Amino acid sequence: RPNPNTHYIDGPVLNLKHQSFVGMHPVPIVYGMTIGEYAKMINGEGWLKGGIRCKLDIIPIQNYTHNTAYKLPIRPSPNLPNAQAVALYPSLCLLEPTVVSVGRGTNQQFQIYGHPSFTKYQFSFTPQPNFGSKNPKHKGEVCYGKDLTQIEKPKRIELQWLLDAYSNFPDKDTFFLKGFERISGVSNLKKQLIKGTPEPEIRKSWSEELNKFKRLRSKYLIYP
């Protein structure tokens, strides 16, 4: 099937010491491949347990390229209600293991973010239990922040929202929750945020591993 986020490749490449159910292989957050292409890579690189290789049958998608716009016919998760949420998820997922709400407990999940302390912002929302989140972060509290529902579909991971949230949160020592390295896939992003590393330097620190991945990826592509 198509992948709605194959139009770019970005993010730190997973360090296997942070391997988990949410990140199993040494790929970036956005790897720019269909599930068939990704399966070819897993097989070809021997990433299955014990290095085994499976018999793989892939039915190619007709008239598809990595830049083909694709809107999922149904929501892939209760907390990814529409195409905008799917597009913003790779960027906003980095706020999940922090004190900041990404809209769980609203009907705009992964399209907004905020915290009760961000009172300089006019936009606000109040998370409440719903089908996708029985006990959302900051339940019943007014959160102030940013509304991203109308912004253009990103062409890279947007670090600006993570940097903005960290900069505006008053108690830096309590900003990160357990599992930030598991979501980001690396140890240094958290350290860079704490240090105040500028965004261009953060991106530069990804570049070598990201370029290696792009070369590896090219071996397994089915679509232009």
Enumerate the predicted regions with their spans.
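Glycine-rich, charge-decorated loop segments at or immediately adjacent to ligand/cofactor-binding or catalytic sites
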Residues: P2-L16
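Glycine-rich, aromatic-lined ligand/substrate-binding cores of catalytic
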Residues: C54, Q62-K139
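Mature-region segments of soluble proteins
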Residues: I9-V13, Y38, G103-Q108
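Conserved anion/nucleotide-ligand pocket segment
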Residues: K17-P90
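Conserved functional hotspot residues or short segments at active or partner-binding sites
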Residues: Q108-S207
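C-terminal regions of mature proteins
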Residues: T197-P224
